[in-house]
Amino acid sequence: HVDEWSAQGRINLFGDTVKVQEMQSEGGAAGAVHGSLQAGALTTTFTASQGLLLMIPNMYKIAGELLPCVFHVSARTLASHSLCIFGDHSDVMACRQTGFAMLCEGSVQEVMDLSAVAHLTALETRVPFINFFDGFRTSHEYQKIEVMDQEDIRPLVPMDKVAEFRSRALTPEHPVARGMAENPETFFAHREVCNPYYDSVPAVVEKYMAEISKITGREYKLFSYYGADDAERVIICMGSVTEAAREAIDYLNAKGEKVGMVSVHLYRPFSVKHLLAAVPKTCKKIAVLDRTKEPGANGEPLY
């Protein structure tokens, strides 16, 4: 749709037409995003699988320089013992250490609603986001959805933060030096300076989820609970599996069982406080459903 909107000259929230630039590879696309952000242009990109891995070196730079952007990823598996192009979380989990926040959706409607949360939070906190959903299972699903009106989102955009971002753009009129080399005694200290930005992310995501919930009538939380209030067995999962899990939970609870599910939306930064608040106090057993194989680890990434 972005190509169509650009070709049609559709105007975005900022009164501009969107320029779509296709690069020679995903590595080139990530480099172009980095340069575009440094020049003060709000920029986003779309990728998946091995293509996302090619972007990792630039992702470290983008996150390290606190450049707000969103990478939309239809999460897909990575070729290992054989090629497979279908959905799992191997690609996005390879990016956990880059400094990108990670927001996950489980349905086409959730993608519509929460993508806005990723963009708004990135602008306010300066932390870049991976906004991901399951490849094929969600990315290629035909589903009737409710589309938010642009005018409903406009009041939520932190225009002061947009102005701040643009004021930091590289320009010959206000020359600055960025991206220099540092020795260990200063590098480690400067690397820690970003912590307050990441600490602020869960609260800001929660704020914008509440605003989107007001617009759509659909409730969103960092960790959404579904099931019996007095559940004794709970599964924790992320992505399209949550849709099937709801059906199973309804069926089992109707038969007298006490089960529930916690759907993870904000995976990074991970808020233990919000997770514990979502799990019923009656819970005795928890099962974590992962979609990534991490050989040699004590548990998979979500676990």
For the regions a language model picked out, list residue spans one by one.
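Thiamine diphosphate
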Residues: 1-94, 99, 116, 136, 209-303
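Short, solvent-exposed amphipathic alpha-helical segments in soluble enzyme
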Residues: 2-5, 60-63, 119-121, 146-149, ...
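Conformationally flexible catalytic loops at phosphate/diphosphate-handling active centers
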Residues: 14, 129-224
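Glycine-rich beta-alpha junction loops
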Residues: 76-77, 133-140, 160, 239-241, ...
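Conserved thiamine diphosphate
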Residues: 85-135, 147, 159
